[in-house]
């Protein structure tokens, strides 16, 4: 993507328009025409930046992926940071449900898993390379992604705070397991 500030502003407007369009219905019911109307850009401008609505939604979710990685590695109160992140996810649940399946698959699920795995592996290796680091890093990523996906799709009950506490407990247990 371009570093041009005008392009960044256009992408930000498209992201906001997408979240606005999905405020009361799922991503699958939203059209490019509606998003471009809300963002006040042409279809041609849309397609200069994104291939389709799914690509726009993944782009709009990039900040969520960074925030998730940071939340799991917060130095202060990780469960509280995770609860805040889950609260933010629930505000745009219609977008995120369209990008992450109930089992954690889909473009957002894959992005979350990959980024979380990479960061967990880096953090574990700061302490020294251990046999099983790759497995633990993958398990941490899968746990976070799977629980968040299950919660988004109504398969994991609880408030953002309760689910954050459960995720944190599982992640800590995984890191202690080898």
Predicted features, each with a name:
Residues 1-3, 43, 73-90, 94, ...:
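Primarily secretory-pathway and cell-envelope proteins
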Residues 1-8, 127, 177-178:
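N-terminal intrinsically disordered/low-complexity leader segments
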Residues 8-19, 23, 28-32, 37-40, ...:
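An amphipathic alpha-helix adjacent to DNA-recognition modules
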Residues 18, 60, 64, 68, ...:
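Hydrophobic recognition helices of helix-based DNA-binding modules
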Residues 30-31, 97-99, 108, 160:
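Short, hydrophobic secondary-structure boundary micro-motifs
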Residues 71-75, 99, 124, 151-155:
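Secondary-structure edge/capping motif, primarily at the C-terminal ends of alpha-helices
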Residues 83-84, 103-146, 161, 165, ...:
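Amphipathic alpha-helical packing segments from all-alpha helical-bundle domains
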């Amino acid at each position: 993507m371009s570093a041009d500030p005008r392009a960044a502003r256009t992408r930000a407007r498209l992201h906001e328009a997408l979240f606005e369009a999905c405020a009361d219905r799922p991503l699958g019911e939203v059209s490019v025409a509606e998003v471009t109307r809300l963002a006040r850009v042409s279809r041609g401008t849309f397609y200069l930046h994104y291939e389709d609505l799914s690509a726009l939604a993944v782009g709009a979710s990039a900040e969520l992926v960074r925030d998730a990685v940071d939340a799991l590695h917060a130095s202060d109160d990780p469960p509280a940071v995770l609860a805040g992140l889950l609260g933010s996810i629930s505000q745009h649940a219609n977008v995120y449900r369209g990008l992450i399946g109930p089992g954690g698959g889909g473009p957002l699920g894959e992005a979350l898993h990959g980024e979380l795995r990479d960061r967990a592996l880096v953090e574990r290796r700061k302490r020294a390379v251990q046999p099983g680091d790759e497995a633990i890093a993958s398990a941490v990523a899968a746990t976070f992604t799977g629980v968040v996906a299950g919660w988004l799709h109504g398969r994991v009950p609880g408030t953002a705070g309760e689910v954050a506490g459960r995720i944190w407990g599982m992640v800590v247990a995984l890191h202690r397991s080898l």
